[in-house]
Every structure is written in structure tokens, then in C-alpha cells.
A protein has these predicted regions:
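Acyl-donor binding region in acyl/amide transferases
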Residues: 79-126
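Alpha-helical elements of Rossmann-like donor-binding domains used by nucleotide-donor carbohydrate transfer enzymes
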Residues: 13-20, 39, 96, 100, ...
Length: 144
């Protein structure tokens, strides 16, 4: 598996794989493939956006999107995960994405990394705790 920051040409080449990945994603939210491709293009060249693709045997098997912002009351830079998708059955790749994101966050001088997931699992919880992440509050969602 190869994790890398995509170029415009990579996104064009991997758009069919990206659409397939989004369509096969099994989660509580149903992402729009077209909007995911647009988000990838918008991330290019933006120093405050982190985007990485994971490719295995020429197929896109996952992507990670994150961003940099400032905490309102402390002024500290924070790196926040925006979206992570992996094809079903592609276990073990979250850790590689986390390593890349942490390196980028340090380079950006972020003080904290915030991660959130639409769905949680015991395995994911163990991975996050083992890597030094601690639960920080609770997220709620309501369809309107």
C-alpha cells in the first residue's frame, strides 16, 4: 500500500476509484461521490488542508482529509480530521494515515489533533488509545 499527497493528475486518474470507494463505503452517512471528488480538488495547494490517498495494486482503497484551524478561546492551532474512508475489509491502514496526519500537524505547529468518527468500534477505540488519543467530549447529530 502506498500513501501519498495526490496531485491534480492523480485525482483525475483515480476519480473512478474514488467514486467506487465512496459508493462501497458502509457508514451512517451516505457521501456524495461527486462532492468527494470536488473536495479532493479543492484541497490541492491549500496549506491548511491535509489530503492523502491510499493506493494498493493501482486501486484507491482509502483517503484521509484533515484541516488546520485555531481554537476560539485559546488561540492554539489545532489539526482536525474532516473525513476518513477505507474500503470495507481494508484493516490496518488507519494507523498509517494517523502517522502521516500527526507528522503534518507537527509541521504546522498544531498543539492538538482532534479525531472524530461517524461510527465507532472497539477495535478503533483500542487503536486510538494505543496511539495516545483520549476521548474528548461527545458528538451528537440530528437530521433536520
Amino acid at each position: 500500500m502506498n500513501i501519498f499527497e495526490p496531485t491534480d493528475a492523480d485525482i483525475r486518474l483515480l476519480t473512478p476509484s474514488l467514486r467506487r470507494l465512496v459508493q462501497e463505503y458502509r457508514g451512517s452517512l451516505t457521501p456524495d461521490p461527486v462532492l468527494c471528488v470536488r473536495a479532493a480538488y479543492r484541497a490541492l495547494g491549500n496549506p491548511n488542508i491535509f489530503i492523502r490517498f491510499a493506493v494498493k495494486d493501482g486501486e484507491l482503497i482509502g483517503f484521509f482529509l484533515g484541516g488546520l484551524s485555531v481554537e476560539m478561546f485559546t488561540g492554539a492551532k489545532i489539526a482536525t480530521q474532516i473525513g476518513v474512508m477505507l474500503l470495507p475489509g481494508q484493516t490496518g491502514h488507519l494507523q498509517a494515515f494517523l502517522n502521516e496526519f500527526k507528522t503534518w500537524a507537527k509541521e504546522q505547529r498544531a498543539k492538538r489533533i482532534y479525531m472524530h468518527f461517524a461510527e465507532s468500534s472497539e477495535r478503533q477505540d483500542k487503536i486510538m488509545k494505543r496511539r495516545g488519543y483520549a476521548p474528548a467530549g461527545t458528538h451528537y447529530m440530528k437530521e433536520i
